[in-house]
Amino acid sequence: MPAASQYLRALEARGLLTCRRVGRRVNYGPTTGTSEGAAGEIVKALRVSFRKAQPIDAIFKLATAFTHPRRIDVYRNVAIGADSFAKLQMTTRIPARALSRHLGKLEARGLVKNEIARYVAATPRHPFARVLASLARR
């Protein structure tokens, strides 16, 4: 099975897409946004995001913020108060170079701020970023 089909099925299984068979083809589309839980929150935020200019670039950049499990762990620890680089390294057990790289990606996406040698969770302005940050904290 092609990778695209597998990804579409995975998104459907999580409630982000619906599929409909039309003859030999299967058409995928966004859900109505009425689903509950994380999928519903994500779909609603994406609908708002697509109304803005240049949505694809912004959504792609934000979606890649939490594509690595360690980055989610780093974000969670920053959100609960592990504010210094040393504290983050101790609580996450991530090597310094990798931790620095993960923090850089989170900073570039507006999810974490570095304020004079301490890290704090930022309040994202983008609706999709807010939903992702909320889900990462869970």
Where are these regions (language model features)?
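Short amphipathic alpha-helical interaction segments
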Residues: 1-12, 93-108
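A short, conserved structural fragment
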Residues: 12-22, 107-117
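Amphipathic alpha-helical dimerization/coiled-coil segments
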Residues: 13, 32-81, 127-138
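Short, Lys/Arg-rich nucleic-acid/phosphate-binding segment
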Residues: 21-27, 33, 115-125
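Short, thiol/selenol-centered motifs that function as redox-active sites or metal-ligating centers
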Residues: 68, 86, 102
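A short acidic, leucine-rich amphipathic alpha-helix
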Residues: 74, 85-92
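C-terminal regulatory/effector modules of DNA-binding transcriptional regulators
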Residues: 107, 113-114, 119, 124, ...
